[in-house]
């Protein structure tokens, strides 16, 4: 059983320290595609967190019964099943957002964060720590997604969660939206700035020169 300090570490380290996007540079593709609006970024965060947490939990529960030779296949089967469940829940209760997310919910199965935590942590750890590790990494992923989405939606549309913050010129206001920030390449540059900022703050994360 994990003690409180270990549980806190499992939840907070991926968010504040070893962030899966900012430091490990994993899961970047979906971060580029679903961050033009806060709503889609938030729902994607919930989806990835749920899949990562529960896949870690279930894989940890059956880890001693999985033959080593087929462990990757078993992990993918668990993850794929959870992705299908999440996709169906979104279609049932948040159909409009599900349409906006399009194929990217289904592509959670290919997200390196989900597979990486299953292989590196859940296969070697007890169920509760594995579950918390999944939540922590999902929240770390979401922290970057929501940061990028905040910048893109406010500067690109003048809104945040659909609420107008910057009055647009078209509506008699003063702000001229930057359409470039609504395009996926803008997310690439914002994530690059986040990675640069994190590694500047923590020089230990900078790769050693050859």
From Swiss-Prot:
CC per GO annotation: plasma membrane
Top EC class for this record: translocase
Residue intervals passing through the bilayer: 42-62, 72-92, 103-123, 131-151, 178-198
InterPro entries on file: NqrD, NqrDE/RnfAE
Protein origin, superkingdom: Bacteria
Topology of the protein relative to the lipid bilayer: Multi-pass membrane protein
Family per record: Belongs to the NqrDE/RnfAE family.
Subunit structure, as described in the record: Composed of six subunits; NqrA, NqrB, NqrC, NqrD, NqrE and NqrF.
Function: NQR complex catalyzes the reduction of ubiquinone-1 to ubiquinol by two successive reactions, coupled with the transport of Na(+) ions from the cytoplasm to the periplasm. NqrA to NqrE are probably involved in the second step, the conversion of ubisemiquinone to ubiquinol.
Protein name per the record: Na(+)-translocating NADH-quinone reductase subunit D
Species this chain originates from: Aeromonas hydrophila subsp. hydrophila (strain ATCC 7966 / DSM 30187 / BCRC 13018 / CCUG 14551 / JCM 1027 / KCTC 2358 / NCIMB 9240 / NCTC 8049)
